A protein has these predicted regions:
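Short helix-loop boundary/capping segments
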Residues: 2-82, 86
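Generic serine detector
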Residues: 2, 15, 67-70, 100-104, ...
Length: 138
């Protein structure tokens, strides 16, 4: 079971504009291996096309108390992700994977969302009302 999976994570690149660097911030959407996805932190390693950059995927419980395996049910995520990104910045700095721990040095620059399927799975998912809103606080 651990060799093959069907998973979907919404990833943002968190770019350190002051040091021309980046890391990955993930929002867990689905994973057939786990009913509830735990927090994950590691370097992107192990395959030819890896980035070698830090990955921080927040725990599923940061977004919902429902299981990924609630098939047929809508699962709503409505969460301020800035505190989670700040946690990722602190952890990346602590582990020596980034130079800056100043939130003002970082920007969300790209995102990707899609299936990562390493086995012979048949999978489909419907996503509705996907949005990201920035709120400037003085």
């Amino acid at each position: 079971p651990s060799l093959h999976c069907a998973q979907t994570t919404l990833f943002f690149t968190v770019s350190d504009t002051a040091h021309d660097d980046m890391w990955w911030f993930g929002v867990p959407i689905f994973d057939n291996r786990e009913y509830v996805r735990a927090e994950y932190m590691a370097l992107d390693l192990g395959k030819d096309d890896c980035t070698g950059k830090f990955i921080y995927t927040a725990a599923q419980t940061e977004f919902t108390d429902k299981s990924f395996h609630s098939f047929g049910d809508w699962i709503d995520y409505d969460r301020d992700i800035l505190p989670l990104i700040a946690r990722g910045i602190c952890e990346a700095k602590r582990r020596g994977y980034t130079k800056s721990d100043s939130l003002s040095d970082y920007r969300l620059t790209t995102m990707n969302l899609g299936w990562e399927i390493t086995g012979t799975y048949s999978a489909a998912m419907e996503i509705s009302r996907l949005s990201l809103e920035a709120v400037i606080v003085d």
